[in-house]
């Protein structure tokens, strides 16, 4: 599974209503922009959830 797909799944697990867009070529340089008043989720929390997938 690609890191992008893992990231998307992790974000949806942490906040099923999250709206975001991201840019980057790897997890290390990804920039996540939270849209539509979504409460931001820390990259550390997202990474921890990604590691479970």
Question: Which ranges hold each PLM region?
Answer:
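Interaction-interface detector
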Residues: 1-53
């Amino acid at each position: 599974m690609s890191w992008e797909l893992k990231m998307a799944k992790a974000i949806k697990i942490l906040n099923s209503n999250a709206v975001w867009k991201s840019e980057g070529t790897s997890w290390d340089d990804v920039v996540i922009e939270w849209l539509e008043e979504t409460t931001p989720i820390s990259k550390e929390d997202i990474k921890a959830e990604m590691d479970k997938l």
